[in-house]
Amino acid sequence: MYTMTVAPGADASGSFYSLKAAFAAMPEDPTVPVTIRVMPGIYHEKLSLMRPNVTIEGAGASPSDTVISFGDYGYEIMPDGIKRGTFRSYTFFVHAADVTLRNLTIENTAGDSKTHGQAIALYAECDRFIAESCRILGHQDTLFTGPLPPEEYEPGGFRGPTESAPRINGRQYYHNCYICGDIDFIFGSATAYFEGCTIASLGPGYVTAASTPEGQEYGYVFHDCRFAAEGCPQHAAYIGRPWRDYARVVLMDCAIGAHIHPAGFHDWGKEHAHGTVLFAEYHSYPQDADCADGCRPFAQRADFVDTLDGAQAAHFSRELVLAGDDGWLP
């Protein structure tokens, strides 16, 4: 185990003044586990982590004490005259196995998606990835769970760090996290399990835009999560829509706020995908026990949304979803 400490430049207690400097100084042997302890502060950095077996943990009392912050956005024009686009807008890009982020805030500060477009906070394309007690903040496209779909809809649409990489599924586990945004703010093709998380809609839009590949058993599973509104009007958001035709999103024992539309999910105008997507719920319940009738219209779900029974729901346990071929159990 190799341990490093990062602290703001004025704090002499840190071995490194930035995460980027710490990344550059990690042991070359990728099998050596590295823990980076990050002292409280705001780190204005755009980061790429390509080394496996790394744990990065905030040393503050809460994740809001240690913030990794940047503000790139999709509509920004690059020096070559081309828009930055979605996949070059990230604050933190992780492309390595066995990485854990703990007690951190990762944010994209670009702001309003109407004027700035897509702005990724965390771009995670990796296997056996864990985010524990983290805040992941943005607006449109806050969290990308790679890989990318096989093909882009428009030329140059996937321009970014993994546009030419093999499309290899990875498993990701988000526990006790706060994730916010407005449009498609959790999206991608990974197998990702969200447990005990707060998923906050900042305005009208869609929480998920899964692109689960055809034949992949699992996409997104939300267990014991809270779908909350922070400035989003009643019935103005959907749990998800299919970025690709085989999207898979399952909710189990989740609290649903009144901001979620009675239909639950949207088909993105893809009526042909009604028979190929898996959008399903088990024991969804209203966030507030005494809320108005408007937040409990689960009988009004779209006809392509399934209700699971207990036996079906058991198939989506954390143990099964994340096991893979190596029996991983975070």
Regions found by a protein language model. Give the residues of each.
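Sequence-level preference for short, compositionally simple segments enriched
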Residues: 1-330
